[in-house]
Amino acid sequence: MVKAVTVLNSSEGVTGTVYFTQEGDGPTTVTGNLSGLKPGLHGFHVHALGDTTNGCMSTGPHFNPVGKEHGAPGDENRHAGDLGNITVGEDGTAAINIVDKQIPLTGPHSIIGRAVVVHSDPDDLGRGGHELSKSTGNAGGRVACGIIGLQG
């Protein structure tokens, strides 16, 4: 089993830890908890770069190794990094539990060294009709991020 972790922090007070596990060539399981977010839905994505030299802005676009349009996690046509939305409760916390086949921890399309980004607004899953729907899901600004690293 391969394990990875990212610790998310932001100047806006968002904190949390997200864990990734993958058994063999199976899907990757994503679990964790975040706090300090406004209640509601927030876009949750793997971005292409593990670069935070300019905060979350330098993490690049959504991880998209095969050049597809933005979509929902269950769509065939989606960026690999499109993990949909997380739901934040009235207390500002979110529990994450995602199983996804397009974010492996090994191989040529591994997400190790890339970034997880939490956005300020809901991801419209490519269906919002906004000019940004097919590229970012119109999910708004980047409120927290962290680099995905291997875990022992």
Swiss-Prot record:
CDD domains: Cu-Zn_Superoxide_Dismutase. It is found in: Cytoplasm; Endoplasmic reticulum. It comes from the Eukaryota. Its cofactor is Cu cation; Zn(2+). It catalyses: 2 superoxide + 2 H(+) = H2O2 + O2. Binds 1 copper ion per subunit. Binds 1 zinc ion per subunit. Cu cation binds at residues 45, 47, 62, 119. PROSITE patterns: SOD_CU_ZN_1, SOD_CU_ZN_2. It holds the Pfam family Sod_Cu. Keywords: Allergen, Antioxidant, Copper, Cytoplasm, Disulfide bond, Endoplasmic reticulum, Glycoprotein, Metal-binding, Oxidoreductase, Zinc. Expressed in fruits, leaves and pollen grains. PANTHER family: SUPEROXIDE DISMUTASE CU-ZN -RELATED. Destroys radicals which are normally produced within the cells and which are toxic to biological systems. Probably involved in the protection against oxidative stress during pollen development. This is Superoxide dismutase [Cu-Zn] 2. It comes from Olea europaea (Common olive). The lineage of its organism: Eukaryota, Viridiplantae, Streptophyta, Embryophyta, Tracheophyta.
